[in-house]
Amino acid sequence: MLVTTKEMFEKSMKENYAIGAFNVNNMEIIQAIVDAAAEEKSPVILQASSSAIKYARINYLMKMVEAATEEHPEIPVA
């Protein structure tokens, strides 16, 4: 499920845990990160650098992230 980082941080600060943030630039990396987060039952932050956005294009990255959240709706993703 897509959530805001504000929601994520509020919960993590109350429950005293960290959230991993990972740079993404293609489908395989997004799949691997979200699959690992699902395996660990952990929220995750996906981020893209300006060069990754230029390389992969923001619309493609957004659709790939949406697909990953549909595959793992139980995992909070920002």
Region spans (language model):
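N-terminal amphipathic alpha-helix/helix-capping segment at the start of soluble metabolic enzymes
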Residues: 1-20
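Short, compositionally biased "basic patch" segments
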Residues: 1-6, 36-39, 65
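A short linear-motif detector with a strong N-terminal bias
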Residues: 1-2, 24, 58
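Conserved, mostly hydrophobic/aromatic
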Residues: 23, 33
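Active-site beta-loop-alpha junctions enriched in small/polar residues
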Residues: 24-27, 49-51
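Short, well-ordered alpha-helical microsegments
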Residues: 29-31
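Active-site cofactor/substrate anionic-group-binding motifs, chiefly glycine-
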Residues: 39-78
